[in-house]
Amino acid sequence: MAFSDLLEQVGSTGRFQVLHVTLLSMPILMMASHNLLQNFVAAVPPHHCQPHANLSMSSTDAVDVLRATVPLGLNGKLERCKRYTTPQWQILSLNTSESLWDESMAETETQSCEDGWFYNMTEMSSTIITEWDLVCDYRALKQMSQTTYMGGVLVGAIVFGGLSDRFGRRVLLLISNLMMAIGGTCVAFSTSFTMFCVFRVCCGMALSGLVLNSFSLIVEWIPTRVRTVVGTGTGYCYTTGQLILAAVAYCIRDWRWLTLAVSLPFYVSFLYSWWFLESARWLVLTKNPEQAVKNLKTVARINGRSAEGDKIDLEMLQESMKKEMACSKGSYSALDLLRTSTMRTITICLSAVWFSTSFAYYGLSMDLQKFGVSIYLIQIIFGAVDIPAKIIVTICMSMLGRRPSQCGALVLAGIMILINLLVPSDLQMLRTSLAVIGKGCLAASFNCCYLYAGELYPTVIRQSGMGWVSMMARFGAMVAPMVLLLGDDYPWIPGFIYGGAPIVSGIFAFFLPETLSQPLPDTIQDIDDRGLARTNSKRLPEKLDLAMKDPSCVLLKESV
């Protein structure tokens, strides 16, 4: 009897699994809120220098004061980061068209905003930008805050991944929920930008812990036949979370209250997480079979199969877990990802795919203001496009194969982003449409690469492989915000990089072997025997893909 048969005995799709998956999915709704929170708490409102402090606004019209103190740029708008050293009252004698640009005024001495900035707060009441004046010389700090957050996600994946295998999924899930709740609360009450960044790093680490342990607990308590459906459902929870963020941000315009609103739900999830049962698989592999038997009997009781649960004993459990226990004794490491030429090709190509997908995805998603429309509306559109994108790529993966779907999604995303560079800025509808298509393609690429990577890596090192490519994705998300700084002098550079990276990685993906209808490899030797050159020409009979075969030695952990 395999463990899957044991799970069927106590009920694999009963009341317990419904409650278990539902409660574990609830925090996923709020994960997108923290990943994309920067779009709203760090939105940059229109701003310009405050007039000289010694000027009396009561005796002079405010518009005239601005004309005399803040120069106009070539676009006819007030300069954001400089003002005249002394008020130029003679400008008021010129008509509007003459004062837009005058050679003599171009040579007038200017200075930085010595008395601070004036912010047009029509869309929000406060952001970290207005709170700490993160504009002009300090504008890079906005991108740095998102980079540090993604750095926390990266560190959390490394830390919580190891701790989870040592101390269990349930304990780490409790810690992650509490860490996210407290970290988010501290972010909301930050008194300095440094404090803000420190606690955002904590939130990033907690998010990784939530992702890793939530998905582990989900897949380890459900049968193989429903993993595809459940995995798709939890993925749509993240998509729904993007829509929730837009709605909450629209209602709460203050960055502190908004941060608090998306953090408080984690206190609730922390409280009900005490109810979760530890994975029976993990308990057996860590030499605690007695507790595993108790948990299985609890599942049987909740599912109304108490009689079947009473039949389970230590001997039956250990017999069902023989294969898992044998696999756990293997001496494999991350170095095995590069052991052979075939493994090196797979690892290098997947690294490029994951890095570029995450890099371009967050590059587009974290710069909503450039589209010139309401950031709340564009957030809803960007979130909604994931729904059809994931459906389409799922169909394509089943009919055309993994490799063409992965290549096509990446190349099409890159083309959409590059074409957008050629569209005039006044054609906002077209620019937004192209960006939405590009973002949808990147979401489809994410959907594809999770399945593709899991099918390419053999069972004995699948967890190490997924951990490595996930780390590359986090690294891409860290770098993405900083690329936006290159657009200060050359606005086309970020778009060129964001568009070029997916196309290049799409070429890398072409060198990956096809896995549609192929059996899951169990060892590195299986990968070498299959061979890159023979992948498309030779298919084995009775083939099973990742969605249908139970990876009993090492369970695939996904991250959103």
Swiss-Prot record:
Topology with respect to the bilayer: Multi-pass membrane protein
PROSITE patterns: MFS
Pfam families: Sugar_tr
Topological domain spans for side Extracellular: 37-143, 192-201, 250-256, 367-374, 428-433, 487-491
PTM (free text): Glycosylated. Glycosylation is necessary for proper targeting of the transporter to the plasma membrane.
CC terms in the record's Gene Ontology section: basal plasma membrane; basolateral plasma membrane; plasma membrane
MF annotations from Gene Ontology: organic anion transmembrane transporter activity
Free-text domain note: Multiple cysteine residues are necessary for proper targeting to the plasma membrane.
Keywords for the protein's UniProt record, in alphabetical order: Cell membrane, Membrane, Transmembrane, Transmembrane helix
This protein's name: Solute carrier family 22 member 6
TM helices/strands, residue ranges: 16-36, 144-164, 171-191, 202-222, 229-249, 257-277, 346-366, 375-395, 407-427, 434-454, 466-486, 492-512
PANTHER family per record: SOLUTE CARRIER FAMILY 22 MEMBER
Ranges of the Cytoplasmic topological domain: 1-15, 165-170, 223-228, 278-345, 396-406, 455-465, 513-560
